[in-house]
Amino acid sequence: MNRLAMTWLGSKALVIACLLGVTTAQAGGFANPTMSASGLGVANAMVASADDVSAAAYNPAGIAWQDGIQAMVGVDFQYRNSSVELPAGIGTNGGGAGNPNHLYASWMPHDGNFGVSMAYNKPYEIDNNWTSTGQAALDLNRLSLDAIFAVNSSLALAAGIDWYLSTLSMNTPGQSFASSDKTSFGGHASMKWKAAPMWSVGVMARLGGKLKYSNSLSQAFSLKLPDEITVAVAHDVADAVRLEFDANWSRWSRVKSLNDQAISMRDSITLMTGATWFWRENSQLRFGYAYDQGANKGTAYNPLIADQTAHKLSLGAGGDLYGVHADVAVGYAFHPKKNVSGAYAGTYRDRRFSFALSVAKRF
């Protein structure tokens, strides 16, 4: 693809993103599923494909088919419109949406069976601020290091450690708390199997860490992150189109409280499907849809974790440009209104947008 065409494509994608706005693509609970622009373009259905260096986050076993040294850097610009309809009027959620960065690197020798990868991203985030309920903000970054083993030309395995770095602040009626945690760890393992010509299967399993917070007033509590597993299958159609379907299960029932706030959450399922059209050499167009089940129960809803079931649409594009590979993507999440009873009764509404940009280089 020539430079003029890539410049045109990039400018059109940027214009579309500006027209749509920028926002978050948060998943059930308080997860942030977008790990790269290429992933967002296919609604994060990437575990079976795992065909660029962001596989370090989606499925590190995919690095086994990516020779040499690679690096990627990017950002996900986010915007959110969240509110609750009450008998007395509309209550606005004053919490914002961050712009999480991501950084990935990998090394896989051309004739070797062992490789390594590194992923740094923001997989979880809370930022909700309600006038009557209070405020909660969790900023969490994860550093993952993996060892990759290519069993043969069709099967690869990977395993690694997760290091969580987080800060938490809360202000609720009668309670204020702020702390940070830099000593929490978890682990994960993954597999990619090229089961047949034009077919691939991926599995990614992660054990959630346990974050521990304390402050100078001897207040302390722990926050468990969910265990999760994703199973995926991808199929290439005539070398021109790739179709993928991913199913993710997250164990949000591990989350029981947020400091003094009781939390009642259910395990959730997210279904993701994506299509990639290889319309030119080294260039792609991407489309995706995801159904994301909310984890917050309607009968015991806590707006400090204001997640809702969502339908997500996304599109993206990528191509080589000036010696690097650039990807852009936009996403929109529609959340049907959620009618809540109990202590925080009301009709909760949410809309989310996202614009992601990633740049990768092979050395």
Please identify what each model-predicted range represents:
Residues 18, 60-63, 75, 87-90, ...:
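Beta-barrel outer-membrane channel/assembly domains of diderm bacteria
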Residues 48-51, 93, 135, 221:
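Short, flexible loop segments at the rims of nucleotide/cofactor-binding pockets, characterized by
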